[in-house]
């Protein structure tokens, strides 16, 4: 019986991917105005369908809560009128961005007279595998459409109802613009085997992008025959250098940890220069503790905070290098900038790292030596985001260096081909 089910699912997923491949062919040369019209129509459809989308999302949230998911997880899953309006606004913003397809990135003339250009082209069919983030359904579909790619969207089972409801609104936009319905498809089953069947279709799917926790990333990378671009965990550090202004240190630590603790660019570890720890840790720790953050500290940091009357607990060995996605922060006092760089090299996840300092030499060295997709100087880790960096919406933040590194906007969803023109040239 299981074998029959597997064969049926395999055929179903192949059929879905074949439809995506056909849609990608049409999208590769679609009129940019038609793509933009589809995005604007989808934004309007989301507004009209708000009640249904929120109703389906409420069912998802209720089921996840009953299953024992934590508050940060539920926050990522939850939609409300404000967030839904933000999703619609994102569609309009993407519609207003410059279309990358056909952009000439370089051109030159060879001594033999050959004219050569490099131009951007779509990747083809993109499989997006993600967890409980309904907004990713729309962001990924929109970015893929704008960049001429077909999207296969595989949300986690907890977000399936929400994603299907959002996909209905997106499909309405496609239909109004006369674009293929298969340009953006949500995998309609929660069966995990469906993902594995799709990952085997390297003849139809050009790229897989997993976005979620370590277990999801590993499962996709290990099972995929399709090239994988990983959006791995964000173990983001904030380092307070010896010259860090105390109030700025407080502001950046609070923003990085508290604003949205359940996202990948939230700060997960605070490093403090030993020479300034006595001055910086008490006000920073107090502000974080007052905001409900549990501080898990190394012995030196714990002693300083306890003396200042700030609630803190000893760190466990695995707290360093951990993505908490919650109001929990690992805290360590380091000897100096070298110590901070060594710690980040050992525990960082290539995502986002930040320094607070008045010392230009320290700032430049931190920028030069830290290995991450974004390095912040006197700015919160929360700024590693496509919208905040001026890229428009993003499909995720890549921690894979090949092809794309950091927030993936429209340009990162294209590749390039050579156009060569001659006059009967032979070699």
From Swiss-Prot:
Molecular function via GO: glutamate-5-semialdehyde dehydrogenase activity; NADP binding
Any single Pfam family the record assigns to this protein: Aldedh
InterPro entries: Ald_DH/histidinol_DH, Ald_DH_C, Ald_DH_N, Aldehyde_DH_dom, G-glutamylP_reductase_CS, Glu-5-SA_DH, GPR_dom
Reaction(s) this enzyme catalyzes, per UniProt: L-glutamate 5-semialdehyde + phosphate + NADP(+) = L-glutamyl 5-phosphate + NADPH + H(+)
EC class name: oxidoreductase
Key word Ribonucleoprotein present: no
Protein family: Belongs to the gamma-glutamyl phosphate reductase family.
Major site of localization recorded for this protein: cytoplasm
Gene label: proA
Gene3D superfamilies the UniProt entry points to: Aldehyde Dehydrogenase, Chain A, domain 1, Aldehyde Dehydrogenase, Chain A, domain 2
Name of the protein in its database record: Gamma-glutamyl phosphate reductase
UniProt KW keywords: Amino-acid biosynthesis, Cytoplasm, NADP, Oxidoreductase, Proline biosynthesis
Record EC number: 1.2.1.41
Keyword presence, Protease: no
GO cellular component entries: cytoplasm
Pathway: Amino-acid biosynthesis; L-proline biosynthesis; L-glutamate 5-semialdehyde from L-glutamate: step 2/2
GO biological process: L-proline biosynthetic process
Localization: Cytoplasm
Annotated function: Catalyzes the NADPH-dependent reduction of L-glutamate 5-phosphate into L-glutamate 5-semialdehyde and phosphate. The product spontaneously undergoes cyclization to form 1-pyrroline-5-carboxylate.
NCBIfam families for the chain: PRK00197.1, proA
CDD domains per record: ALDH_F18-19_ProA-GPR
